[in-house]
Amino acid sequence: MNPVPAQREYFLDSIRAWLMLLGIPFHISLIYSSHTWHVNSAEPSLWLTLFNDFIHSFRMQVFFVISGYFSYMLFLRYPLKKWWKVRVERVGIPMLTAIPLLTLPQFIMLQYVKGKAESWPGLSLYDKYNTLAWELISHLWFLLVLVVMTTLCVWIFKRIRNNLENSDKTNKKFSMVKLSVIFLCLGIGYAVIRRTIFIVYPPILSNGTFNFIVMQTLFYLPFFILGALAFIFPHLKALFTTPSRGCTLAAALAFVAYLLNQRYGSGDAWMYETESVITMVLGLWMVNVVFSFGHRLLNFQSARVTYFVNASLFIYLVHHPLTLFFGAYITPHITSNWLGFLCGLIFVVGIAIILYEIHLRIPLLKFLFSGKPVVKRENDKAPAR
């Protein structure tokens, strides 16, 4: 077992929490965007569409880098089997809890909102299964992907550790140019795989289980491993925490390319493959933008920040059905998109915080939504991982 840094990575805790909480304005703005969702406003807003696209273009790539960073830190702290058990429990238990308590009621509500309840009995067995796979996993998809990644990394992290024992990691040098080329190739590789599947057997791409377990894992795994490498190599971490005008400019140009692809691309052509290449390199450059920004402004301990770090997962889990409820039953009564967006934020965040405070007072719910046994500690002010 290797030692881990004693200094708390406050800025990474904060970034991870804020990235998760960004899911709230992301999904509320989705209601008012030009993108088709479960519920939409009568007229889309150009600026809220732009805001929605911006968040969507990089948020989860950066999130998985941080997840990989902390996962490898715990990999060095625990024996292999315990590491796998701890990691899977911390993401798997909240996911399994949220399905019957959150996404199943959400699915039932949407069946009536969208007028599909009467047609449900007429669906084939496969269509019912596939619909449930999409709707019950829903916004919990990243937890399922983390379970898959953790299982894969039992082997990957062992290989990384064994290779480090036979090499001098101090001589490893990284550059953003080299990383950009690597991630460009990874994006092209992913695009080739997706296009091949589209040619050979296109229906599998609309299968929810295949999409989450295979395609999402395949896309985000490089970011997860990059996070682990950032923990191992201080030079790589410094590359991300040091502000880079080149990365900022490249990310801005990549986002413009992302918007153009969204506007002019066609799903029947190469839109999704092009998007995977763009978001692969955009995600890499945004790691530098977000890490350097967070390292400069968020690398401190604060009771208020700690509260939201601890609350972020629960708030994210409950915000989705609250957002859809707001979109289905309240949005039609608000004529202004921006007013609706602000009211949605107040509605969702307010109720989510109230529910969070209630669940803290019920030990069983606290365990189910965190995946961690409830342990009473005195003066424990450190944010939970």
UniProtKB/Swiss-Prot annotation:
EC number per UniProt: 2.1.-.-
What family does the database annotate? Answer: Belongs to the acyltransferase 3 family. OpgC subfamily.
Would the keyword Nucleotide-binding turn up in this protein's UniProt record?
Answer: no
Q: In which pathway does it act?
A: Glycan metabolism; osmoregulated periplasmic glucan (OPG) biosynthesis
> PANTHER family recorded for this chain?
BLR4337 PROTEIN, GLUCANS BIOSYNTHESIS PROTEIN C
Q: Which UniProt keywords apply?
A: Acyltransferase, Cell membrane, Membrane, Transferase, Transmembrane, Transmembrane helix
Q: Provide GO CC annotations from the record.
A: plasma membrane
TM spans, by residue?
17-39, 54-76, 88-110, 136-158, 179-198, 213-235, 242-261, 276-295, 308-330, 334-356
What is the protein's given name? Answer: Glucans biosynthesis protein C
Where in the cell is the protein located?
Answer: Cell membrane
| Molecular functions per Gene Ontology | acyltransferase activity, transferring groups other than amino-acyl groups; transferase activity, transferring one-carbon groups
Q: Which domain of life is it from?
A: Bacteria
The role this protein plays is: Necessary for the succinyl substitution of periplasmic glucans. Could catalyze the transfer of succinyl residues from the cytoplasmic side of the membrane to the nascent glucan backbones on the periplasmic side of the membrane.
Task: Give the membrane topology.
Answer: Multi-pass membrane protein
Q: What class of enzyme is it?
A: transferase
Give the disulfide map.
Answer: none
- This protein's record includes keyword Lyase: no
Record GO biological process: glucan biosynthetic process
Q: Which NCBIfam families match?
A: PRK03854.1 (NF003014)
